Amino acid sequence: MSNFTHINASGEANMVDVSAKQETVREARAEAFVHMAPETLELIVSGSHHKGDVFATARIAGIQAAKKTWDLIPLCHPLLLSKVEVQLEAIEAENMVRIESVCKLAGKTGVEMEALTAASVAALTIYDMCKAVQKDMVIGQVRLLEKTGGKSGHFKADA
């Protein structure tokens, strides 16, 4: 169990001590997808959804979620994010929305969880706003795309 940084020798979960780490610029990108019926996607794309602009609401929800990750994930550090960006793209040929988030900071710990949380909550917001017209939407393929900075260096997911 000692390979997990959040688990001590006794098997207890603790927040990692990052006080001795170097401050570096760190960035992470994540993605999520929401699969839906063509009619649901058309409501979003055309802007005719009765609840308003689904993409704008999901974008703001994702940004807010990134800033609150430390409140949601028990062992995450509160971070002073310098950038949070959430992009949403309708992929009509596949009846889905792709969400990509980017989080950045200069700090002692990474922003992977913030990027993943932003993408996830944006996807959940799309579901919430559209569930009245379709309940069988599928949220999936949430993953880290890339991260830079820090001791572990650069990571890029396979395409």
From Swiss-Prot:
Read off the CDD domains from this record. MoaC_PE
Q: Does the keyword Lyase apply?
A: yes
Q: Which reaction does it catalyse?
A: (8S)-3',8-cyclo-7,8-dihydroguanosine 5'-triphosphate = cyclic pyranopterin phosphate + diphosphate
> Which Pfam families does this UniProt record tie to the protein?
MoaC
Q: Which organism is it from?
A: Aliivibrio fischeri (strain ATCC 700601 / ES114) (Vibrio fischeri)
Q: In which pathway does it act?
A: Cofactor biosynthesis; molybdopterin biosynthesis
Q: Which Gene3D superfamilies match?
A: Molybdopterin cofactor biosynthesis C (MoaC) domain
Q: What is its EC number?
A: 4.6.1.17
InterPro entries annotated for this entry?
Answer: MoaC, MoaC_bact/euk, MoaC_sf, MoCo_biosynth_MoaA/MoaC, Mopterin_CF_biosynth-C_dom
Q: Does the keyword Cell division apply?
A: no
Enzyme active site? D128
Which keywords appear in this protein's UniProt record, sorted alphabetically? Answer: Lyase, Molybdenum cofactor biosynthesis
Q: Which domain of life is it from?
A: Bacteria
SUPFAM superfamilies recorded:
Molybdenum cofactor biosynthesis protein C, MoaC (SSF55040)
Where, in this chain's numbering, is substrate bound?
A: L75, C76, H77, M113, E114
The protein here is known as Cyclic pyranopterin monophosphate synthase
